[in-house]
Swiss-Prot record:
Residues 1-105 are annotated as: Disordered. Residues 382-418 are annotated as: Required for interaction with YTM1. This is Ribosome biogenesis protein ERB1. GO terms for molecular function: large ribosomal subunit rRNA binding; ribonucleoprotein complex binding. PANTHER family: RIBOSOME BIOGENESIS PROTEIN BOP1 (PTHR17605:SF0), RIBOSOME BIOGENESIS PROTEIN BOP1 BLOCK OF PROLIFERATION 1 PROTEIN (PTHR17605). It comes from the Eukaryota. The lineage of its organism: Eukaryota, Fungi, Dikarya, Ascomycota, Saccharomycotina. GO terms for biological process: maturation of 5.8S rRNA from tricistronic rRNA transcript (SSU-rRNA, 5.8S rRNA, LSU-rRNA); maturation of LSU-rRNA from tricistronic rRNA transcript (SSU-rRNA, 5.8S rRNA, LSU-rRNA).
Length: 805
């Protein structure tokens, strides 16, 4: 048996040689196959050498196999032969489509052929020091260079190779030619291969060629390195010198000196929005905190639910998105079967209703009268109304409006009754008539006996308060010669021992001592006025030290020159003429522009005037004892409307169109700037205690400012329908008033507390009516009696009125 086996193997070797020789002959004889350039001489020599080495290896293997086979038993050999016969029977193909000669020739050619890969030669050179240098082949950076995208030679796709088991080929190449199956070894050879594993054996078949898939030494070495977790690239040095990027030494100086961004320490607005959403959900009950949820669960567990079987069903809480349908309105008298006669339409109304379109009708039925309820027919519009209601319910959007159950009385502040706040003026007791023009201004002397009024007819009249009798009159303006001059302001000197009356007429200011007081008072007043002529400097007066906004100077040199410059004459003090002396005028002050407002200091030596058209000299401070006029402002701060002194501090309140500025005259600085928020202010007045201010505006508002609080108004009163002309405080009582062009005077109670924590209490008391509106002008000026709760008003109806309790 052993000899027979050896003879069989020898026959196989000779057959393999014959097949190789036949393939060479056929390749030379067949002109169809073009193999030029594919195999060169060197490759052939290498193939011959590989073939000879393969023969030597085969003979050596045969000798080894012979030695091993001698030790095998006869039964094992019979078993192997049986398997070989079985394999041969399985390898029969269905060759109905192919000729027997072709199949035999192809199988003979392919059997025994060993495919080997020709490795590219490695070119070695030397470095300058003589060491060998390996030059690796240059990688061609094309799409085929990526191993994962290598084009497959066998283009069968995902079709398994088992489909081609009964065919001589295993697939097709790119050109559509068959890829023939390589020669198979016998079952005995396969068994021997599994016992003695050849070099690079894997036990796998190549899908493209169908031959066994072996791995090279380099690949095997690479796999072993990966298993041992070693470096796969020899050019990489794992023990390179360490570069200590992050040292153990602490760095003192920062890597970056950039300032911290603001977002690092400012709360995030986005987080605040998210938190507010969560807070809102918690307040609405959509989110229950864990503690509360735990308490509710414990409460549910502890509660004993005893259900009343015979009770009404409990109402379940509706979902938050569930809105109940609105209820239908209750029926009215028109829908009654026996409505009153006034609800029954006439024939004309019925015809008009029938001619009106359905969508424009006020109601869908015509009221009718029936004797009894059983005679009422069916309602024809019931189906239509139900259908339209259904459309409204599911098409029209709805929203839930939470009604606030608030007592209306709780919204009204608790104010004392006006009866408890008496006395205050409630009626007109005296009317002072006699002027032929509008009475623009009035003033009452410190004694409270005499009332002075100035009118557009150019006259100033003095009235006795109690009797309403005119005791003095002086004509200061001749309307024929000076039709544009008007009397804008009349003010008594607060010093009752002098009896001086200041009258602003056009560009002039007249100081009058009317002969109504007696010799002592009249003489004291004239002496006070004449005493100032001893201080006359005849135009050589240097610039005064009173400069409230001295910081407005452009440079230090200009300030130094200003200290030595001669003062410009902003106003001139003149002795009266003979005619003026006959009118009891003691002195005349001539200004550059018309004087609109005049206000005295509490001591009676200074008074301030306002000339809105005079620019930086709009505000002038006049000193009676020295006949001196000063302009405290170097630059104008808008159009000045009014100016007044503080009741007891050296401060000046200047009112422009939009702002009220408070200046300290002793320190010559701006103390505060009030922002009333009105478009055009008209008048201001200061509380006798000096910590509150009221301002009136032409946009129908009265503004109360608390000087101890913010610069914005504490209260804004909107009771008037037209421009507010005047607002005044009472000097002794907690009262103030406001007068407007609508002809009304509003009386208010104003209590200012000593406690700084309490805000002033403002209570409206009375609305006085009596003045007539002429030429869109109503009440032009008001003033309080110095002692009593009496109010005096001047109107555009040529009258002045006294309002008493």
């Amino acid at each position: 048996m052993v000899k027979g086996r050896k003879s069989q193997k020898a026959d196989k070797v000779t057959k393999a040689k014959k097949r190789v020789a036949d393939e060479v002959d056929e390749s030379e004889s067949e002109p169809e196959l073009q193999v030029e350039g594919l195999i060169d001489a060197e490759a052939e020599s290498e193939d011959d050498e590989s073939f000879e080495s393969a023969e030597e290896n085969a003979s050596a293997e045969e000798d080894e196999e012979d030695e091993e086979d001698e030790e095998d038993s006869d039964a094992e050999l019979n078993k192997l032969l049986a398997e070989e016969e079985g394999d041969d029977s399985e390898s029969e193909y269905n060759t109905s489509d192919f000729s027997e000669d072709d199949t035999k020739s192809m199988t003979d050619k392919l059997s025994g052929v060993k495919l080997t890969t020709i490795a590219e030669p490695i070119i070695k050179t030397k470095f300058s020091d003589g060491t060998p240098r390996v030059i690796k082949p240059e990688i061609n950076p094309v799409y085929d260079s990526d191993d994962s995208d290598i084009e497959s030679k066998n283009t069968i796709g995902n079709i398994p190779l088992s489909v081609y088991d009964e065919m001589p080929h295993i697939g097709y190449d790119v050109n559509g030619k068959r890829i023939m199956r390589p020669a198979r070894a016998s079952a005995l050879d396969q068994l021997l291969d599994t016992i003695e594993l050849p070099e690079g054996w894997t036990g796998l078949l190549d899908k493209e060629s169908g031959a066994s898939l072996n791995i090279s030494k380099e690949e095997l070495e690479l796999i072993s390195k990966i298993q041992r977790n070693e470096q796969t690239d020899e050019s990489t040095n794992p023990y390179e010198p360490l570069i200590d990027w992050f040292t153990r030494h602490e760095e003192v100086m920062p890597l970056s000196a950039a300032p911290e961004p603001k977002r690092r320490f400012v709360p995030s607005k986005n987080e605040a929005k998210r938190i507010m959403k969560i807070v809102k959900a918690i307040r609405e009950g959509r989110i229950i905190p864990p503690k509360k949820m735990k308490e509710l669960r414990e409460k549910e567990k502890s509660e004993d639910f005893n259900y009343d079987l015979w009770g009404d069903s409990t109402e379940t809480n509706d979902h938050i998105m569930n809105l109940r349908a609105p209820k239908l309105p209750p029926p009215t008298n028109e829908e009654s079967y026996n409505p009153p006669a006034e609800y029954l339409p006439t024939e004309e109304e019925i015809k008009e209703w029938e001619n009106t379109e359905y969508s424009e009708r006020e109601r869908n039925f015509v009221p009718k009268k029936y004797d009894s309820l059983r005679k009422v027919p069916g309602y024809t519009e019931s189906v239509r109304e139900r259908f339209e209601r259904s459309l409204d319910l599911y098409l029209a959007p709805r929203m839930r409006k939470n009604k606030l159950n608030i007592d209306p009385e709780s919204l009204i502040p608790e104010l004392p009754s006006p009866k408890d706040l008496r006395p205050f003026p409630i009626r007109c007791s005296t009317i002072y008539s006699g002027h032929e023009g509008k009475i623009r201004t009035l003033s009452i002397d410190p004694t409270g006996i005499w009332l002075a009024t100035g009118s557009d007819d150019g006259s100033v009249r003095i009235w006795e308060i109690l009797t309403g009798r005119e005791v003095y009159r002086v004509q200061l303006v001749n309307k024929e010669d000076n039709p544009e001059d008007n009397i804008h302001s009349v003010e008594w000197n607060p010093d009752g021992s002098v009896g001086i009356l200041a009258v602003a007429v056009g560009n002039n200011i007249f100081l009058i001592v009317p002969p109504i007081f007696g010799y002592d008072i009249e003489n004291a007043g004239k002496v006070r006025i004449e005493h100032g002529f001893g201080y006359d400097t005849f135009g050589s007066t240097k610039k005064a030290n009173l400069e409230v906004n001295g910081s407005d100077l452009e440079s230090d040199d200009e300030a130094a020159n200003a200290n030595t410059a001669v003062k410009k004459q902003v106003a001139q003090w003149h002795k009266p003429t003979q005619r003026q002396m006959e009118q009891d005028i003691c002195i005349v002050i001539v200004c550059k522009k018309p004087v609109k407002k005049l206000s005295w200091h509490r001591k009676g030596d200074y008074f301030v005037t306002v000339q809105p058209d005079s620019g930086n000299t709009s505000v002038l401070i006049h000193q009676l004892s020295k006949h001196l006029t000063q302009s405290p402002f170097r630059k104008s701060k808008g159009i000045i409307m009014d100016a007044k002194f503080h009741p007891f501090k050296p401060q000046l309140f200047v009112c422009s169109q939009r702002y009220v500025r408070i200046y300290d005259l002793s320190q010559q600085v701006l103390v505060k700037k009030l922002l009333p928020g009105a478009r055009w202010l008209s008048n201001i007045d200061i509380h006798p205690r000096g910590d509150n201010l009221i301002a009136s505006s032409y946009d129908k508002r009265v503004l109360w400012h608390d000087l101890d609080l913010a610069a914005t108004p504490y209260k804004t009163l909107r009771y008037h329908d037209k421009a507010v002309r005047s607002t005044t405080f009472h000097k002794k009582l907690p009262l103030f008033c406001s007068a407007a062009d609508d002809g009304f005077i509003h009386i208010f109670h104003a209590t200012v507390y000593d406690d700084m924590m309490k805000n002033p209490m403002i209570v409206p008391l009375k609305k006085l009516t009596g003045h007539k509106v002429q030429g869109h002008l109503g009440v032009l000026d008001t003033i309080w009696h110095p002692k009593e709760a009496w109010l005096f008003s001047a109107g555009a109806d040529n009258t002045a009125r006294m309002w008493t309790t």
